[in-house]
A protein has these predicted regions:
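N-terminal, polar/charged subdomain of small-to-medium soluble alpha/beta proteins
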Residues: 1-115
């Protein structure tokens, strides 16, 4: 049996971007995850702990450095998928500063990976 976890608004920072200066200092990013997990029974030990998945998403954004937002979204999705019991992950990575500088409500990239 599987179930889906929706983890939204995971705020973090990282050094990502293709434009000059974007990697010079950390920028804000927000990650949303849709994670399909295996569920055995009503015990935490039988599924994926959402706190661990949130920590993984933050660590990926903070650790790695990519030119493309799309590449960052794939890295987050793949790192979350690596956890036991995770079957499928959709990760959306929002870059608020890019939205503001382009006078739009939001700029984000999404990636979906599965076993």
């Amino acid at each position: 049996m599987t179930s889906r976890l929706f983890l939204t608004g995971i705020a973090t920072s990282g050094r990502h971007g293709a434009n000059p200066g974007e990697k010079d200092q950390a920028q804000d990013f927000v990650v949303d995850l849709d994670v399909e997990v295996e569920v055995g029974d009503d015990e935490l030990s039988s599924t994926s702990d959402y706190r661990t998945l949130i920590r993984t998403a933050r660590e990926t954004v903070e650790r790695d450095s990519f030119d493309l937002l799309e590449s960052l979204a794939h890295a987050v999705a793949n790192d979350v998928l690596a956890h036991d019991g995770v079957v499928k992950v959709s990760a959306i990575v929002h870059k608020p500063a890019a939205a503001r500088s382009n006078e739009v409500q939001g700029i984000a990239a999404a990636a979906t990976v599965e076993r």
